[in-house]
Amino acid sequence: MSQYSQNQSSGAYPTPPVSTGPYVAPPPLGYPTNDTSHATVATVETKSKGDGFLKGCLAAMCCCCVLDACF
């Protein structure tokens, strides 16, 4: 007969802790969070890139109108 009893106390394997909810993965590195312990806010300056896009659109519309009138 074996020396080890099958009815030993469950002290070797304690019950797992009760979870507080589903696991939520942490955000990726560099993702802004609500943690304000290291809040260093850098001011962002915007630069105007000019009105090249507007001029290009107007030129394209004029070109379409001229081609439509010619053909």
Curated annotation (Swiss-Prot):
Annotated membrane topology: Single-pass membrane protein
Compartment(s) where it occurs, according to its Swiss-Prot or TrEMBL record: Cell membrane; Cytoplasm
GO cellular component: cytoplasm; plasma membrane
Compositional bias of kind Polar residues: 1-12
InterPro entries: CYSTM_dom, WIH1-like
GO-annotated biological processes: cellular response to hypoxia
GO MF: identical protein binding; protein homodimerization activity
Pro residues bias (residue ranges): 14-30
Region feature Disordered, mapped onto this chain: 1-36
Keyword check for Ribosomal protein: no
A Pfam cross-reference name: CYSTM
Keywords tagged on the record: Cell membrane, Cytoplasm, Membrane, Transmembrane, Transmembrane helix
Binding partners and assembly: Homodimer and heterodimers. Interacts with CYSTM7 and WIH1/CYSTM13.
Function description: Involved in resistance to abiotic stress.
Family note: Belongs to the CYSTM1 family.
Name this protein carries in UniProt: Protein CYSTEINE-RICH TRANSMEMBRANE MODULE 6
Source organism: Arabidopsis thaliana (Mouse-ear cress)
